[in-house]
């Protein structure tokens, strides 16, 4: 896409286009090499771990932090950090491994807890029991946010255009463009709004604009919840379960005060909340 933009911009100057394309190519290669460098193959067994063709013994492991930030850009930033007696540190970036949950479970249960095999957690939810639960809802207002105002403003304009359609074909073209732009913004922004319901046994996460879609977690199977900054005007919430499966939810509709109230509620249920984006002073 960027190359096409350069091509249009520099169509009258071929030398500038070539230089611009080469710059983009160098940037793409640099980023790709950075990802490859930080995503080597990993082999685990009960004796140790092979990382970047180097074998490390588990009996030399001094500390293991399986959740937390690793400082890698263009990713969620979550990683596992293993530190050995010689001060060697291994960072396993979550987003680079499709089986990261299995890797972390092995380290937690087999290496740290000395279990003979990995315990599997039952995530099946009793829907009847779920409806009986009294829950506190954290919803916010998805309309009166920057992205919400942009999205609904365009939709209102899309509905108003036919009423004032008196310029013929020009308005028809504008109407088609508004329809496309409104649909695009709806698809982009609707994923940014989630509401939460917290009861004694369950945490429910619902999409505000696709209310029939939801995630349900048992409170006693949640290991940690992370509040992080997604953009200048939006935060996000990551739910990490005890088997190290994780999912991120954008919460542009929830104010900082609402998130802090939710944090207090979660901590009251003995859930660790890692707040990386909101001042609590």
Where do the protein language model's features map onto the residues?
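Short, mixed-charge, low-aromatic patches
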Residues: 17-22, 37-39, 59-66, 117-124, ...
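Non-transmembrane, membrane-adjacent beta-strand/coil modules in membrane-associated proteins
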Residues: 50-104, 122, 205-263, 276-281
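Conserved beta-hairpin
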Residues: 26-65, 183-217
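Secondary-structure junction/capping motif
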Residues: 70, 141, 169, 275-276
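N-terminal membrane-targeting/pre-transmembrane regions
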Residues: 1-10, 87-89, 95-168, 244, ...
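Extended alpha-helical scaffold/tether regions of large eukaryotic proteins
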Residues: 271-272
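Alpha-helical transmembrane spans
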Residues: 1-40, 138-195
């Amino acid at each position: 896409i960027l190359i096409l933009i350069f091509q249009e911009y520099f169509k009258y100057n071929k030398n500038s286009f070539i230089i611009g394309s080469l710059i983009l190519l160098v940037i793409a290669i640099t980023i790709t090499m950075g990802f490859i460098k930080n995503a080597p193959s990993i082999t685990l067994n009960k004796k140790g771990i092979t990382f970047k063709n180097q074998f490390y013994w588990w009996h030399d492991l001094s500390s293991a932090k399986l959740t937390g930030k690793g400082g890698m850009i263009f990713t969620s930033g979550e990683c596992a950090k293993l530190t050995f007696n010689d001060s060697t540190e291994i960072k396993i970036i979550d987003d680079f491994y499709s089986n990261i949950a299995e890797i972390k479970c092995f380290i937690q249960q087999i290496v740290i807890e000395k279990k003979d095999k990995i315990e599997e957690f039952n995530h099946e939810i009793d829907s009847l029991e779920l409806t009986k639960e009294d829950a506190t809802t954290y919803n916010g207002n998805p309309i009166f946010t920057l992205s919400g105002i942009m999205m609904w403003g365009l939709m209102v304009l899309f509905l108003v255009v036919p009423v004032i359609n008196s310029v013929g074909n020009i308005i028809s073209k504008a109407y088609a463009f508004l329809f496309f732009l409104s649909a695009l913004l709806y698809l982009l922004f609707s994923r940014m709004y989630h509401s939460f319901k917290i009861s004694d046994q369950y945490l429910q996460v619902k999409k505000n604009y696709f209310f029939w879609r939801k995630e349900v977690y048992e409170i006693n199977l949640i290991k940690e919840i992370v509040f992080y900054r997604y953009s200048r005007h939006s935060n996000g919430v990551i739910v990490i379960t005890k088997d190290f499966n994780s999912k991120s939810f954008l919460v542009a509709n929830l104010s900082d005060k609402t998130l802090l109230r939710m944090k207090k509620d979660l901590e009251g249920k003995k859930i660790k909340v890692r707040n990386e984006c909101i001042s609590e002073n």
